[in-house]
From Swiss-Prot:
It catalyses: N(1)-(5-phospho-beta-D-ribosyl)glycinamide + (6R)-10-formyltetrahydrofolate = N(2)-formyl-N(1)-(5-phospho-beta-D-ribosyl)glycinamide + (6S)-5,6,7,8-tetrahydrofolate + H(+). Its EC number is 2.1.2.2. (6R)-10-formyltetrahydrofolate binds at M99, I100, I101, L102, N121, D163. GO terms for cellular component: cytoplasm. This is Phosphoribosylglycinamide formyltransferase. HAMAP family: PurN. GO terms for molecular function: phosphoribosylglycinamide formyltransferase activity. The record marks D163 as: Raises pKa of active site His. Pathway: Purine metabolism; IMP biosynthesis via de novo pathway; N(2)-formyl-N(1)-(5-phospho-D-ribosyl)glycinamide from N(1)-(5-phospho-D-ribosyl)glycinamide (10-formyl THF route): step 1/1. Belongs to the GART family.
């Protein structure tokens, strides 16, 4: 039985490409049913199209413009969940560079209603360290102040608290004296691709 996933992206789609490559090489026995982006210009959509994967664009900005006063993010979350529910056989939702914090309305659709669907995210920090944005830069600054010698990445299940859900996989990444922020970010990205693919493999074969 094929394990079906939905991938949410916001940008270049390098993590998406890593998943596509792992499927094409037969390392992953999964099917990407749909790639959804909140940005029409996201290059990851082109990567999906080249691999003959269905794509959808669902922008938050439209909701903010229509009703900037009320809680439009909650409405956006509900509507996004409805789109994913159109694909009745989804087994896993993967956030691969998705830059919008998902509201509780979205998360509860997949935790409170059947069938439940796990949602996983990649965060460039170890559990309990550097939640939120700019995690690599914050780790690099702490390294320069001799506060840490390494950082890392984790793949975790998504809950309402940012970057705090059940951990699926972690990978420690040393910070070298010769590192620049750019070289450290590159090493992080290389490991992110591997770890995201490995996490999908773990969940699809359990």
């Amino acid at each position: 039985m094929t394990f079906n996933i939905c991938v949410l992206i916001s940008g270049n789609g390098t993590n998406l490409q890593a998943i596509i490559d792992a499927i094409e090489s037969k390392y992953l026995n999964v099917c990407i049913k749909v790639v959804i982006s909140n940005k029409e210009t996201a290059y990851g959509l082109e990567r999906a199209k080249k691999a003959s994967i269905e794509t959808r664009v669902f922008s938050l900005q439209k909701y903010l413009k229509q009703d900037p006063i009320n809680n439009t993010r909650s409405t956006y979350g509900l509507e996004l969940a409805k789109i994913i529910r159109e694909y009745s056989s989804i087994d896993l939702i993967v956030l691969a560079g998705w830059m919008i914090i998902l509201p509780a309305t979205f998360l509860k659709e997949f935790t409170d209603n059947k069938p439940t669907i796990d949602i996983i995210n990649l965060h460039p920090a170890l559990p309990g360290q550097y939640p939120g944005a700019h995690a690599i830069e914050r780790a690099f600054n702490d390294f320069k102040e001799n506060k840490i010698k390494h950082s890392g990445i984790m793949i975790h299940k998504v809950i309402e608290e940012v970057d705090a859900g059940e951990v699926i996989l972690t990978k420690e990444i040393p910070i070298l004296p010769t590192d620049t922020l750019e070289s450290l970010e590159e090493r992080f990205h290389q490991q992110e691709h591997k770890s995201l693919v490995e996490s999908i493999k773990l969940l699809s074969t359990k």
